[in-house]
Amino acid sequence: MAKVALVETKPSRTDFRREFDGAFEFDQYQLCSDPGIKKVLKRDCDIDIDTNIYDWIVLVGSDALKYFTKINSVTEYSGKKVEEKFLPVINPAMLKFKPEARKTWDDSKDSIIKYIKGEIEEVIIDDSIAFGIEDTDECNNFIQQALDHDGDYIALDSETTGLYPRDGYMLGISLCYDGKRGAYISTEAFDETTEELLAKLFKEKIVVFHNAKFDMAFFEYHFNFTFPRFEDTMLLHYLIDENPGGHGLKQLSIKFTPYGDYEKPMYDWMDQYRKEHGILKGDFQWSWIPFDIMKTYAAMDALCTFMLYEKFVKIKQNKKLAWVYDNILIPGCRFLTDTQDNGVPFNRKRLEISQQLMQDDIDKAIATLYENPKISEFEKINGKDFNPNSTVQLRSLLFDYIGLNPTGKKTGTGAHSTDAEVLERLSEQSEVPKLILDIRQKSKIKNTYLDKIIPQLDRDSRLRTGFNLHGTTSGRLSSSGKLNMQQLPRDNPIVKGCIKAAEGHRIVAMDLTTADVYVASILAKDEALMDVFRSGGNFHSTIA
């Protein structure tokens, strides 16, 4: 029988032997021996355990997982083997206030028991299933094998130096055609024959991506490839689960394939490289990763995408879901790929003028604030200049010195809030909050939009950012990346006024007012409500 340890955060009343159905014996440990500590920090941990004497170590909750592995998300890894012997699991105590996690617990428990009893065969990732190709002849032979294979589809992925085609280039492509092995091919191995073979492959086979919008953009921009038929495992999963944040290839591979966190060795290498060279995480360049380090991770991307497609494509047996996928999500993906490539046209000169005008307005607003006698008096009493960006000073000025009545809204630490909503209400009592709010609003427009847009414009004065089909539970589009185009200021036209239509074109603003009610009236077959929309009437006044 395997020797097992179980580690929880601190002493609790949870009977873990009962929770695991008495399926195995274990030694129980706590990170912190003091049950009175509310939030256990690293300095509170006094655990004394020799991990080498155990075959398996069950880590209960996120604290234990992070302590031993530096991984934060226990839900993502629950029931999966991490490194050589760690088995993370969510804390069963959470089921009392989060009953929807019951399935996660049950599945994780069954998986852990099988690991400990030796009923799960260890999966080894080596060159037999994930390999690299740097030789041109070997590259072309592998692509020819994919063409000759009798399967209808292939899985395709790319490794790039940037998030946008104009900001980076392709380091290599990953390809899987049989669901048994994946290859990572360096673009340095490409020749004219390679490109001809790939063009033919993409024309004859269904190409399966995970996040097609990203990969297609690079393939189309840098190689002019086309994809007449493509699928997207990310969007297929979105049909199953609309909740944002859970559609990544890593997360789904951990959950639905036996290969788990296959990318961890590469990220461990990256962490070590950054540490040795004193490089910040945001400054690390993907091109610095050696081919021999990259190849396994990249090849596994294609293999796992293939496996996910085999599992998720069954969803399309549901005709309603298949219709949404085939008629909305896939065409929408194609449309948004083109939209992102087209970009948003800005007038660079007007942006620069607006930037200076806004700075002038900010300077004037600050000058007006400092001319207020309340500010000069406050500075004399405190013996230092007033900083409007300091929430501590602002709180003292508004509530202690001027004596305004707090709104009752508090911060997470229990202090009186000074956010925009609070300042708006306090403006009824004094001019100072109004002046502060004016400075904040103008500074946000300049810092968040004008200053950010200008350096990110491409040479054609267009901003190319992201639009997403899978970012909301409501089915609405979301925007992310270089700039969230859905959050341009409404109350100040200075930013939107810098968007410039191309010659011969116009910018059109359209808003589907009460679209959800419109759809509901049709689905409910409510004739009276439908008549309101047919006649162009006002829904709200009619209901009132």
Please annotate each region the language model reported.
Residues 1-122:
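A polyanion-binding, active-site-adjacent surface
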Residues 3-4, 53-56, 202-207, 383-385, ...:
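Short active-site oxyanion
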Residues 4-6, 13, 18-27, 122-255, ...:
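Conserved RNase H-like, two-metal-ion catalytic cores of nucleic-acid enzymes
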Residues 56-60, 206-213, 387, 511:
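Short glycine-rich phosphate-binding loop at a beta-alpha junction
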Residues 63-65, 214-215, 393:
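Alpha-helix capping/helix-boundary segments
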Residues 118-186, 244, 255-257, 269-494, ...:
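Conserved "right-hand" nucleotidyltransferase catalytic core of DNA-directed polymerases
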Residues 498-520, 533-544:
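Conserved catalytic alpha/beta cores of large enzymes that bind or transform nucleotide phosphates
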